[in-house]
Amino acid sequence: GHKVKDKTMAEQLWKGRFSKAVDSRVNDFNSSIRFDQRMIAQDMRGSGVHAAMLAKQGIISEKDCEDILSGLASIADDLASGALTIDPNAEDVHTFVEQTLTARIGDAGKRLHTGRSRNDQVALDIRLTLRDYSHTLQAYIVELVKVICRKAAENTTAVMPGYTHLQRAQPITFGHALMAYAWMLLRDLQRFEDATARMDAQCPLGSGALAGTTYPLDRQFTAEKLGFAAPCPNSLDGVSDRDFCIELANAISICM
């Protein structure tokens, strides 16, 4: 397997402004790898599409693009097999991927970030990750509703007391009680679908740090390839918006 040297990744990002070694506590404070390593698959998915767009637009060569895509695939394979592990000393998952990629394919790896900022990259990664989580949760809800409906159908004549204000009020069936939860969960499902649809409406990639880039990017291409309806119309909104996170958290809290 391929190895990436420890202790260097986080330091390389910060050493340029300092004459002495950066204190480990500073690196630890600035590091987000423990949180954002869960986004590594989505980060590489976005990078692959970004590389394809750069080659399509003539910003990087086809050879660079091929090397980048094969390098990303090899990283994914080695992570899956255990031949490669995420460096806990890396500042973030994006740095880990880029430096691992460059170690494997050379200078082509350095050209991957052309026309892209950490800001639009992170905004994209979060959307892709939450979309995947939302789809997983939606599938779980659908399966749970199916089980509830099946059990309710088996208990259409099983009588039980219905309560109001902690007092027995009216006789109902166990099936009727179960179906109340099925209907609640179906509303939860709609909330997840609605939040995800809004998340998928606009792709932030290409927004740059906050005001785009002078590179001739094809934002429609990347938006479509990544499953978005369109590029976000305002670059500042694209990189600063996090209301989709709150919306999904709201749907989760109601479901719980």
For each of these PLM feature ranges, what is it?
Residues 219-239:
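Active-site-adjacent "gating/activation" loops or surface patches in catalytic cores
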